[in-house]
Amino acid sequence: MIKLSNITKVFQQGARTIQALNNVSLHVPAGQIYGVIGASGAGKSTLIRCVNLLERPTEGSVQVGGQELTTLSESELTKARRQIGMIFQHFNLLSSRTVFGNVALPLELDNTPKEEIKRRVTELLDLVGLGDKHDSYPANLSGGQKQRVAIARALASNPKVLLCDEATSALDPATTRSILELLKDINRRLGLTILLITHEMDVVKRICDCVAVISNGELIEQDTVSEVFSHPKTPLAQKFIQSTLHLDIPEDYQARLKASPETDSVPMLRMEFTGQSVDAPLLSETARRFNVNNNIISAQMDYAGGVKFGIMLTEMHGTQEETQAAIAWLQDHHVKVEVLGYV
C-alpha cells in the first residue's frame, strides 16, 4: 500500500546543508499497522510527511496504492491526498466549530451534499465513541476526545491510509491506551493501513504488526514486532526494548551493592529473556547443572507481537566457578545477563 524507495531529503539552511533522510526504503503492506520509532531529530516526522508529500523528497520514489505521487500535478496530488488521512500530536481543531463542524470540514471543501455529510459525520462520530458530542466545542473536550475528533476528521474522505505523527505524545498514559485501542479497532473494522511514528516502544508494542528503527535519517532495522523484540539486531533497538521493561534495584540492595566481589558476597544479575528463553525453565536447569541457587528479587513480563519477553533481577548463590559457568550457559541459551555488582 505504501512503498518508499531510496528517499533522500535535504534541507538548506543558509549555507548549511542538513540531510534529514538518507536513502530510506520502506514497504507497508495493505491493512497493516506499521510503526517507525526513533529519538527526537532522527527524521521520523520528515519521513511520514514525505508519504503525502507535505515534504517533497529531494530524491526517491513515493507510491501509495500503486500510484507514484512525486510525478503528479498539483490537482492530481490533491485528489490523491484524499486517500491519505493524517493526525498529529496537536489536534489542530477549529475552536469556532463544533465537533460535527470539524469533522464535516473536509467533506464541505469537497462539495459533498449536505445529507451525505450528515450521514457520514454521524457514522464517524459513532465509530470514534463521540456520538453524543455532535454539538460540543473543542474547548469543552478532553485531550483524548480532541484526538478522537481529529481521527474522525482524518477518516471523513474514506481514505485507504492513515498517517499518525506522534499522535499520542501529548496524552496521558490511560488516554494513550484508549486512542491506541481505537486505532487498532479502526484498522480491524475498515482494513485501514496505518503508518505511525513514535519515540515510545510501548506504542509499537501495543498495536503494531511491523516496526522500523530510524537513526540519523537512516532505517537501521526493520522487521515484524515479534522478531525485533525477540532478536534485536542493533543497540538502539535493544535500548528501546529495555525502555518498556525497567526494574529498579531496591534501596536496601543498592546500599549493599559493591563493584567487586568480597568474601561471602554473591553476584546480582539482570537477565533479559526473549523468544524461547522466556518459556524454558532455565533457572531451574542452572540449579541442577551447576549447583547454584537463584534468589529472584523482582521480575516483569510482557507481550509484543504475540511474543513474550521479560526482565529479572536475581542473586545467584554458588562458588565463583559455579556462577561463572551458570552465567555462560544462560548466555548460550539466548539470555542476556549483566552482572550489576555484588551483595
Curated annotation (Swiss-Prot):
It comes from the Bacteria. Residues 2-241 form the ABC transporter domain. Keywords: Amino-acid transport, ATP-binding, Cell inner membrane, Cell membrane, Membrane, Nucleotide-binding, Translocase, Transport. GO terms for molecular function: ABC-type D-methionine transporter activity; ATP binding; ATP hydrolysis activity. One of its GO terms (cellular component) is Gram-negative-bacterium-type cell wall. CDD domains: ABC_MetN_methionine_transporter. SMART domains: AAA (SM00382), NIL (SM00930). It is found in: Cell inner membrane. ATP binds at residues 38-45. Belongs to the ABC transporter superfamily. Methionine importer (TC 3.A.1.24) family. The complex is composed of two ATP-binding proteins (MetN), two transmembrane proteins (MetI) and a solute-binding protein (MetQ). This is Methionine import ATP-binding protein MetN 1. It comes from Salmonella choleraesuis (strain SC-B67).
